Design a protein with these regions (language model features):
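Conserved catalytic cores of soluble enzyme domains
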Residues: 96-177
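A structural preference for short, pocket-lining loop segments at secondary-structure junctions
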Residues: 49-62, 77-104
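Flexible beta-alpha connector loops of hexameric P-loop NTPases
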Residues: 66-73, 105-110
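Short glycine-rich loop/turn motifs
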Residues: 42-46, 55, 90-91, 117-120, ...
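Intrinsically disordered, low-complexity segments enriched in small/flexible residues
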Residues: 1-56, 60-67
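A short, small-residue-rich loop immediately preceding and capping a beta-strand
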Residues: 56-59, 68-70, 90-95, 127-138
Length: 177
């Protein structure tokens, strides 16, 4: 990340928060007993903090941890966070850099991912805004969150949002993209 002049996930959170705002990190040990090799907390840092003097739920993908790809712990964590958002009527800010679903875990993740996407649309209907800021690759499932957000900001010359890369397009259609 440093060699590419990118901020780390926690630095992005600190930069976003109001000066001297505390950050209450939620579910940092999610997936502690998971054997997928992702370690505790999954591939996002999530918590509550003040942004423009308003309590917000902040979710930051850890792009330096398996490309921010989503494992079971991360998908479960997102569902639980969605419940907390709705119960506490919080707007959400996503700091996105995600390779989408970790393919070896996809059979364990797709149901949770679908529920998570449904939660995003339900929150929008309730007037609970979702804002996404994309800092790097947002691939496949990682592209859905900014695509479904009420507001999306893409970092100039860095953000890339796509559902499939050239190898997958070639495999599926036999065409070069």
């Amino acid at each position: 990340a440093r060699s590419r002049k990118k901020m780390l996930a926690r630095e992005r959170i600190e930069y976003l928060l109001d000066k001297d705002s505390p950050f209450l990190e939620l579910l940092p040990l999610s997936g502690l007993k998971n054997d997928s090799g992702f370690g505790p907390g999954g591939t996002n840092i999530t918590g509550i903090g003040l942004v423009s003097n308003k309590l917000c739920m902040i979710q930051s993908n850890v792009g330096t941890k398996k490309g921010g790809s989503v494992d079971y712990a991360t998908s479960y964590k997102s569902l639980r966070i969605g419940e907390i958002i709705e119960k506490n009527k919080l707007p959400t800010i996503n700091l996105v850099e995600s390779g989408g679903v970790n393919l070896p875990d996809q059979d364990k993740i797709f149901i949770n991912a679908g529920k998570n996407f449904k939660q995003i649309t339900q929150r929008s209907k309730l007037g609970l805004s979702t804002i996404s800021l994309v800092f790097g690759n947002a691939t496949a499932g990682g592209a859905y969150v900014p695509g479904m957000s009420d507001y999306t900001i893409l970092q100039k010359n860095a953000a890339k949002v796509f559902l499939a890369g050239p190898p997958l397009v070639k495999m599926a259609t036999n065409e070069i993209s």
